């Protein structure tokens, strides 16, 4: 099957794809998911993708493509999703966690513009749980994400990823730190 993309030239259209990465089998806060999907939907991008742990009869919001996750560990699944998205559309990518509270279209646009303009090679948004809520790349690079632990696996996956980006010589655009639904900052 061939994907055909028609892109109208518009000043306010961002030639980037946004991937919403849903971590299975973790329970997901419905309000955070709706907020994240709403922010992605309101951002003028070329492609919106929902990356799920298993592909079946999931509810798929209008305007989103569906990509299944493959691979075992968290970092392997991220690498595979980025590669699969890039294989069908060679556009820069923003991968987001939908459990981050406060994602806005402006945040996504800022990250996308930094990649498109060449100001940055990567975009990174730190998360309150020590992970990250945003990873933006101009092209996939397995070495950056394979071995990164999941947010529920302990350690400091955000710091590890940021260190890898720096070691690779990437210029990194930093997004604001966001709280993660279910962490103490949002519980109470």
Give residue ranges: language-model regions:
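Short phosphate-binding loop-to-helix
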Residues: 60-93, 153-154
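Conserved alpha/beta core of the MobA/IspD/sugar-nucleotide pyrophosphorylase nucleotidyltransferase superfamily
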Residues: 5-6, 160-188
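N-terminal nucleotide-binding beta1-loop-alpha1 segment
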Residues: 1-26
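Short, glycine-/small-residue-rich phosphate/pyrophosphate-handling segment
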Residues: 122, 139-165
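Active-site acidic Asp-centered loop
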Residues: 96-98
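A short, N-terminal amphipathic alpha-helix
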Residues: 29-47
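Conserved donor-nucleotide/metal-binding helix-loop-beta segment in metal-dependent transferases, i.e.
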Residues: 102-129
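Short, polar loop motifs at secondary-structure junctions
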Residues: 51-57
């Amino acid at each position: 099957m061939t994907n055909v993309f028609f892109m109208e030239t518009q000043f306010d259209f961002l030639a980037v794809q946004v991937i919403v990465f849903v971590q299975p089998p973790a329970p997901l806060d419905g309000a955070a998911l709706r907020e994240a999907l709403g922010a992605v939907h309101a951002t003028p991008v070329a492609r919106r993708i929902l990356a799920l742990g298993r592909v079946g009869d999931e509810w798929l919001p209008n305007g989103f493509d569906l990509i299944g996750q493959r691979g075992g560990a968290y970092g392997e699944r991220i690498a595979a999703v980025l590669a699969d998205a890039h294989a069908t559309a060679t556009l820069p990518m923003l991968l987001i966690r939908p459990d981050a509270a406060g994602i806005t279209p402006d945040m996504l646009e800022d990250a996308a513009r930094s990649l498109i303009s060449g100001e940055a090679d990567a975009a990174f948004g730190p998360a309150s749980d020590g992970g990250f809520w945003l990873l933006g790349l101009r092209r996939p690079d397995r070495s950056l994400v394979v071995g990164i632990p999941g947010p529920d696996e302990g350690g400091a996956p955000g710091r590890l990823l940021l260190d890898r980006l720096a070691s690779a010589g990437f210029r990194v655009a930093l997004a604001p730190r966001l709280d993660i639904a279910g962490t103490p900052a949002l519980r109470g």
